């Protein structure tokens, strides 16, 4: 199992390094967040988080779409790795992208977020990853439409979170909704593997 996990990790690392769309979008997002209009905006906190969701979501979407389009799911079955491991390894790399964007935005984040905000921010990033995976699984040749719908859902959830004023409820809501969609996304991966076996 450990050797198979290493194989999967190497595969995902290779894809992560050469996912040019995600890297280009990450650079654009970082540069755009330093525009004067963005830095002085009253919605700076929402804008930065929306940028993070956009960049990490694009990475997850492209990665899953590649797996589905080029028999990556079959590869997963052949090496005997459970779909849950695939989800969390992809989440690891999307978290790295999130970290890069947040580190690059430290001057913009000062006074906007506190450390405790990570308890609801990170679940939303995970939620976005799950939504992107689900949309990639049901793309059916309409890549742009599926991606746009997934991003819209993620942004809508982010808006809902911002409307919640009680910090504790914000954390609970983000964690519960994220756990639900992570469960759904992993079940969909299992169903993909099952259909390959038929």
Regions found by a protein language model. Give the residues of each.
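Hydrophobic alpha-helical transmembrane segments of membrane proteins
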Residues: 1-71, 87-198
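Membrane-interface interhelical connector segments
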Residues: 73-75
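Short helix-to-coil transition segments within interhelical loops
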Residues: 77-83
